[in-house]
Amino acid sequence: MSDSSQIRIMIVEDHFVVREGLKAIINSQKDMLTVAEAGNGRQAVEAFEQHQPDVTLMDVRIPGLNGIDAIGSIVAKFPNAHVIVLSTYGGDENIFRAFQAGAMAYFLKDIKGQDLVDAIRAVHAGQRVVPPEIAAQLAGRVPLTALSPREMEILTLVAKGKSNKEIGAKLAISEGTVRVHASNLLSKLHCSGRAQAVSEAIRRGIIEVE
């Protein structure tokens, strides 16, 4: 099969071993070829512009510009981009935001090799692919009242174990203001306490904690 008839694929993944594994699966297919790789979101956007692959495999949690924002940047410039998300994380907000950004498929990284290459072919043909476990997450999604940037900052700091005093000092606001924002975000997440809010936010992919 000639190169012109192969599906040209870009892999965006910050873990070398995972990237090499994906490349081996792809390059074992006669109708597929890896044409570009990237280890972070900014590299992904630049590599897409340079190579304009037929299908992109995109991790969500990558350094710098995250995968979802990278998808948004790519699709904004190339509306016909075909992106498949491969992620360790299946939180409903992650999934929702990925599709909202322009992804055509979302899979967890435990996907079998044959299922992956089948999905690549389907997405290349213009089909959206939503496996049952991902569809179930979307179906059960509770719409999130958007957290403000300040609430997101506070939630992330709470997740890191910071006290109201420490949060206030870091953000240059009073402890009282921290408490008000914390109360608001608890209400939006439908949680009764901070520990529950952090657990829920991580589970749903609203925040990331290193």
Where would I find each of the regions flagged by the language model?
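Short amphipathic alpha-helix used as the core "switch/output" element in two-component signaling
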Residues: E46, I68-N80
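Active-site residues of response regulator receiver
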Residues: D59, S87
